[in-house]
Each structure stands twice: as structure tokens, then as C-alpha cells.
Swiss-Prot record:
Its cofactor is [4Fe-4S] cluster. It holds the Pfam family Aconitase. This is 3-isopropylmalate dehydratase large subunit. Its EC number is 4.2.1.33. The gene is leuC. Keywords: 4Fe-4S, Amino-acid biosynthesis, Branched-chain amino acid biosynthesis, Iron, Iron-sulfur, Leucine biosynthesis, Lyase, Metal-binding. The keyword Hydrolase does not apply. The lineage of its organism: Bacteria, Bacillati, Bacillota, Bacilli, Bacillales. It comes from Bacillus cereus (strain B4264). GO terms for molecular function: 3-isopropylmalate dehydratase activity; 4 iron, 4 sulfur cluster binding; metal ion binding. Pathway: Amino-acid biosynthesis; L-leucine biosynthesis; L-leucine from 3-methyl-2-oxobutanoate: step 2/4. Heterodimer of LeuC and LeuD. [4Fe-4S] cluster binds at C337, C397, C400. Belongs to the aconitase/IPM isomerase family. LeuC type 1 subfamily. SUPFAM superfamilies: Aconitase iron-sulfur domain. InterPro entries: 3-IsopropMal_deHydase_lsu, Acnase/IPM_dHydase_lsu_aba_1/3, Acoase/IPM_deHydtase_lsu_aba, Aconitase_4Fe-4S_BS, Aconitase_4Fe-4S_dom, IPM_dehydratase_rel_enz, IPMI_cat.
Amino acid sequence: MGKRLLDKLWERHVVATNENGLDLLYIDLHLVHEVTSPQAFEGLRLTNRTVRRPDLTFATMDHNIPTKDVWNITDRIAKQQLDTLRENCKQFQVPLADIGDEEQGIVHVIGPELGLTQPGKTIVCGDSHTATHGAFGALAFGIGTSEVEHVLATQTLWQRKPKAMGIELKGKLPQGVYAKDIILHLLSKYGVAVGTGYVMEFYGEAIHAMDMEERMTLCNMAIEGGAKAGIIAPDEKTFAYVKGRKYAPKDYESIKKKWSELYTDLDVVYDLHILVDVTDLAPYVTWGTNPSMGVRIDEKLPEKHDANDERAFSYMGLSPGQSTYDIPVQHVFIGSCTNSRLSDLEIAASVVKGKKVKEGVRALVVPGSQRVREAAMHKGLHRIFEEAGFEWREPGCSMCLGMNPDQVPEGEHCASTSNRNFEGRQGKGARTHLVSPAMAAAAALYGHFVDIRKESYDGAISYS
């Protein structure tokens, strides 16, 4: 009997197994940011420990930083966390991409673009959306602060092996429909707990057709379905993406042969299998307060089924049976570790080129990293956005979460390319609607949601 991709990744990293069935995994890459690391580093000091492998650790500033006036940090706690990370990285000799550094950006954007993220690695970070890196055939998952300390001190982590879920995506995506819509469709159909206890492996015709940035979007939101991680077997697109990047292996050809072994064998059975035909999918919009509360753009909002629906409708200021086209949009956020890469910005720019943001709408574009920002500016995307009425910002987590200056006022609606729409996620009382970059860009032009499939733009990604 063959092995699943999860089995191969797991077995290659088991150092020991204890009497409770937990495996001690070796960690190949530990990504660090300013929010979940201060207590972990302090724990090292209190126990007189060092960072076991600073060469396998990489830190950046992303969650708390302003994206407009980046050096003017007025929040006392945010400034303290940023200063503390600088001090910790200096003391423990951990590489740091600080504000203004050419390598700085959202942790799950810079990992792949710098070549730190590679097939076959185990990757952890004190952040829920570490699953993003699974798009490269890596086993990547978020950890808590006590686990951050454990990895810093030992470069290992005790874990119980999850079950394997296979999600087969067959067919070809229609124009105007993207990876973001696939994951929102899956969540709306199967809920936020379907992946509990599992690692989701995405595969199939639609996966083969996607570029790496769309694959990252899928894996990024596997956690929203309750999964430990999301993974995709590496292929030639993966290898080509990694090749030549700053931290990519120097012995690329020999390493590539090992990477080519990372796939699920044909004769295996998943613990759970889901089949989705993407051919007839439509753009999705979330209406409620978790990512599974979403509908196709051409559907009406659902009826109330329980107290959760009742609360969500009340919080969002919406009604059952309401048209998605009637949902007002006062804010648009194009960014986050889900959709802030160059291809995301290119799609959004193609939608708004030569047009104007609706009066009364505040629209932000926040590139995921300094390198994404520079590449976008080289293509002139910043001029397209600014001429349309968007704000062009510096890299950071920004409006994805309400812990920096970029927030949505209470009671107002935001079309957001981020990954979570919980109550207060973008600020106290903020009403978040998760959509693709194309849908967010179009909403900025109209002040409400529209069906991007009916708009004239040339931003479709080729899936040939």
C-alpha cells in the first residue's frame, strides 16, 4: 500500500514517539513576528536558554505596523512589541526583516518569495494562517506562544498526527472565479469544522492549472475549515517558483529530485474524500460572522436556521432573502496574507483601470511585502490604483485585523480580501465581507457588490 503526502512529510520528521502516541517532529523553518513571540523569548531568558537554530528562524514585522506613516507608531503596546522583537532578535541572533527592510512584509508572503518556504519542510509560526506554506508541499501549521518557545529552544515540537482529507477539484474555473471563491464555496457547503483533526490535501485538474499564488490562497484558508493544515503536492510550477530565490537551495537539481517524491501514491485511500467540480462555481460573498456564512453573488441571503444566524444577521445589519447586490460597501481592503501578492494586485488593477472609486467609499491596497510593492510599482499598478481613488500603502497585515491603525468604523461594511469575518475582526462593530480581489475592486467602484463576471476587464488568470 502506498503513502499519502501527509504520511511522507510526517515520517521524514519524526525524531521520537512517546507512550501517549505523540510524535516529536523536527522543525525545518520557524517564522516569527512581533505579536506571539515576546513571552517565548522571555521564557528563554528565564531558563537561561538560547535559540537552538537561529539559522532556521526568520522574523519580520507585520501585524502591528502602520501602513501609512510606518515610523509613526502611536500605540504604546504596538511600539513595545516591535521594539521587543528587535531586542530579542539582536540578543538571540535571529535574522529580522525590520520596517523599511527590502525583505519585510507579511510573514506568509515573504516566506515563499524569499525561498525560505520549500517542498518537504516542516514550517511553524505563531500565526493561524501558517497553512499558506502548504501550497509548496510543506507541512505548515500555526502554533501558540508556549510552542513558539519550545521550538526556539529545541527546534522540535510534540504533535499528534492528524488524519488525511483529500479534496479533489475537477474541471476548469470560469472567468471571474478564483481560488478565493473555491475555498469560500467549500466552507459554505461543509462548514468551519469539517477539517477538525485533519490535514486537507488539495489536488486535481483545477489545482494543476493554478499558479502558486492561487494555491497559497487555498491553503491559507484551510484553517477556516478547522484543518490543522492545507497541503498541495509540489510540481514543476512549484519547483520553478522556488528556483533562484535568495534562500533557495544552492544544489537545486539534486534537491529537486527529492522534492519530486512528494506526492500521494495512486493506491491510497484518504480518511475523508471530498469532490468538487469547479466548472459552474460563481464568485462568493460572505454575509455573516464566520467564513462559512457565504453565498454565490447570484443568490439571495439565506433564511435563519438557528441562533447563530439570528445573531449574525443582527450584527451585520442584513436580512434573510436580501439580494447580495443590495449590501452597501463603505470600505474596501485589498491585502492580507490571503490575497496581497502581485497577481492579486494585477487582477484588482485590471478591474479599476480607467475608472473611479464610488464617492463615499474608502479603498485601500496594501501589498503583502516590500518586494510585492516594488514589483507592482515597476508595472505601474500604483498609478492605476491612485488614479482610481485607492490609497496605496506600505506592506503589513493592515485592515485584516483590528490591531493597527487600519480599521473599519463601527456599523460600516468592508469588502475584504482577507480570511476572517468574525465580529470585531476589522475593528469594533466592523462588518466584514470576504471576497476575491476582483470582487473587492468592483465593489469599490459601485459602493455595493456586483457580479464581476458581468464586468468588462482583462484580469482573468489563464488556466490553460
